[in-house]
Amino acid sequence: LREPPIFVCIHPNCVPRFPELPHAQMIQFSLFNIPVRVLPWFWLTLAFIGGVLRADTRSEIFELLLFMLAGFISILVHELGHALTAKHFGKRVEIVLQAFGGYAAYSGGGRLSRFQSFLIIAAGPAIQILLGVAALILVIQVEGLSPYGKYFFVKLCQVSIIWAVLNLIPVLPMDGGRILETLLGPQRLRLTLQISIAVAVIIVILSLVYNIDMLLPIFMGLMAYENYKSLKSISWM
């Protein structure tokens, strides 16, 4: 089972197929006995979102690197929330950070109850929001932070809280959509898909009307389309 990517909130099946890069360029490590893989496209898309095309001066490039570090920590902590909770329930887990986000994969163990599934899904955005709040408290309370230090923790706060909140939008396959699916139950999958499509379309319209960053309506449009295909497929069953 794959969790949806985080920082742009788009499922692996909904993103363009990026060419495979040599595994030598992949970062691999273990954290809390959980394998973690960071694919090269993760850094490239994170740099794009951070404004690499606008970074001209040495200071702007350094700020971009700090933003990428903040994004990496925030997304990794989010996925650890999913993974550690799943591991607590006896699952084998792995974390992958890829283009436009990441996911926690888990398998094995016994069948999860709806409440256990809810806890696994909710743990990601919950711990990410706590990380953002901790970064905000640090910025407010700690005196003597360097300008770059303050910039880093402000960005860590922003990306953690904003991305976690976006990921709680009730649109499949984001965490909010998964929570809705868990609460309504498998018998109401059609209703979950209908709600996901409606919310995604509303967000696309509002994003275009209020000229919000184009990434959000693009990805919401993709998710609306994927959910529509899923709805059509179960209609034939």
Please name every model-derived segment.
Residues L1-R2, V8:
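Intrinsically disordered, low-complexity Ser/Thr- and Pro-rich stretches
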Residues R2-E3, P19:
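Intrinsic-disorder/low-complexity peptide segments enriched for small residues
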Residues V8-M237:
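Hydrophobic transmembrane alpha-helices and their immediate loop junctions
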